[in-house]
Each structure stands twice: as C-alpha cells, then as structure tokens.
Amino acid sequence: MEAARPFAREWRAQSLPLAVGGVLKLRLCELWLLLLGSSLNARFLPDEEDVDFINEYVNLHNELRGDVIPRGSNLRFMTWDVALSRTARAWGKKCLFTHNIYLQDVQMVHPKFYGIGENMWVGPENEFTASIAIRSWHAEKKMYNFENGSCSGDCSNYIQLVWDHSYKVGCAVTPCSKIGHIIHAAIFICNYAPGGTLTRRPYEPGIFCTRCGRRDKCTDFLCSNADRDQATYYRFWYPKWEMPRPVVCDPLCTFILLLRILCFILCVITVLIVQSQFPNILLEQQMIFTPEESEAGNEEEEKEEEKKEKEEMEMEIMEMEEEKEEREEEEEETQKEKMEEEEK
C-alpha cells in the first residue's frame, strides 16, 4: 500500500494540466460518443420504391394469403403497384392516423382503379419493420369468425389483407415527429386494388386454386395471371392532393416547352435577318432611352412646340398687320383719286 503512494502523487501531478486544458477535450469526446451512439441506434426508413422493401412486404402478403385457414380457393396473387405506393406516401406525409378521404374518388388515389382499400399501422420509428406491421394486421383474424362473417372487434385490416379480388398492393412508411402519444413515430400504409369491403366473407373456402380464372395459374396457392400481374409504371401520375407535389413534366408539358424554345429561336433569327437587310430600320438611339434622357427629350419637345406656336402667332400677327397696311394704302389711293377727280 505504501509503495502505491508515489505513483498516486505522480499521477495527480500529471493530471493537473488536464484539469486546466483538457476539460474541453473530454467534453468534446463525450459529445462525439453520444453522437456516434445515436447514429448507430438511428434507423433509416426505406423509400417506397426501394426494391428490398417492396419484395419484403409483397412476399409477406402472398405468404399470408396463401396460408389462410380455412383454405382459400380463389385468392389472387399480389404484385406491386407504384401508384398505390405513391398514394400511401402522400397520405402518410400528413401524419394522420385516419383513413384517406379520397379512396372512393375516381383518379384521386389511382389513375386506373377506384374504391381502393387501405391498411394503416403506427408505432415508434425505431421499432418499425414491414413484417411487424403486416403481421399485426394478420393477427386480427382472432377476432374474425369466418363461419358467420362477423368480427368481435376491429378486424378490417385482416379482411383487406386476405381479400380475394385484391391483386395490387403499394405501401410506404413515413417518419412523423408525433402521432397521438407516440413521439418519433412511423406511419406505415398499404393501399390495395381492388379494395375489400365488410359486406361478405373475404374469400371462398375450398381447395386452393380451384376457383381461379380460365387463364390463371396456381402460384404459391394463389391465382396468378401474367397479364393481370404485369407491372405498370405510371411515370407522370402523382396524387393531385399531395403537398408539396413532385415537379413532373408530362409529354404535353415537354412539347409546349420545346415549342416555346423553338419560337424564341425563330424570333431571334428573324430579327437578325431583318436587321442585316435593313440596317437603319431600328436605331439604338431611338429605341433605348434612360429615364433621364426620356425626360430631357420630352422637355425639348415641349420647348420646340412652344417655339412653333409662338412663331405661328407672330406670323399671324405680321400677316394681319400687312393686311391692315394694304387696306390703308388702298384707302389713301382711293381718296387721292377722288380728290383729283374733284379738281378736274
């Protein structure tokens, strides 16, 4: 124990400069560690067009639809739809845990389908996975009685998940600062076409794929169709009500833009040709004036007009005086003639 004292005193002596100049370094190191830890714990939510994200939720939908109990005879195979995912993203940006008010409106949530279905999930952002959200919807089957088609609670998400006629799905997850009592929340929305209802059972029970269409084939216990399942990329379509709306120039917009550029070029060429053929048709001094020059020019014009008016007045006065003199001369001559006649 006694041998450790010099070491302790030496350590304290070396730590004195640290107390003076190294406190700031320690604070900066602590801040860096906090930032590093937060960055490691932070999760980045996937984009709605991320391929891995799309494959995850589409495959899980088909897996759960193909594994329904009782077995389904007419459930369709689901594929991704970009317009539905854009609608999910647009509504998710509002950070409202309420259903989209445009689902039944024509071309408001999809350029082709109307009567769109929608499932929603809200939870902490750092806990989100597509699997957790979709399986929470599937868990609602516990509240659904397939025999009489009734729910003991809210099972609308499950019904839409296994709705037989739905074959297109598009999902998106959006971060929100707060939804309800959840801070740093994530809202996950999936849209379906055609959408389901609560008016009947979600599918027809029976041996899988026995009630598929004529041109359908059985894929993973579901009815697939190459034409129906073909992906359509709606390049220029976005929800009209999305704010802020993405800037998109469709073919008509591109045509008008090119037409304006062409007209501008033709106008410039025409002006250059006219100026080359008639060099004096436009004089720069006559076409371009500064405000001071224009005011000075106006004053000069007014002065010139006043001079002209004065000159005209003077000319008129001179003419009147000349006429008066001529009359007086004529009168004098007439009087002289009369006098001469009288003398004779």
Curated annotation (Swiss-Prot):
> Region (Disordered): which ranges?
292-344
What is the membrane topology listed in the Swiss-Prot or TrEMBL record? Single-pass membrane protein
The record, for InterPro entries, names:
CAP_dom, CAP_sf, CRISP-related, SCP_GLIPR-1-like
Quote the subcellular location field of this record: Membrane
Any GO BP annotation = sexual reproduction
> Acidic residues bias located where?
292-304, 312-334
**Which factors induce or repress this protein, as stated in its UniProt record?**
Up-regulated by doxycycline.
Q: In which tissues does this protein get expressed?
A: Highly expressed in testis. Detected in prostate, kidney, bladder, lung and bone marrow.
Q: Which Gene3D superfamilies match?
A: CAP (3.40.33.10)
Keywords recorded for this protein, A-Z: Membrane, Transmembrane, Transmembrane helix
Q: Name one GO cellular component term.
A: extracellular space
**Biased composition range(s): Basic and acidic residues:** 335-344
What's this protein's name?
Answer: GLIPR1-like protein 2
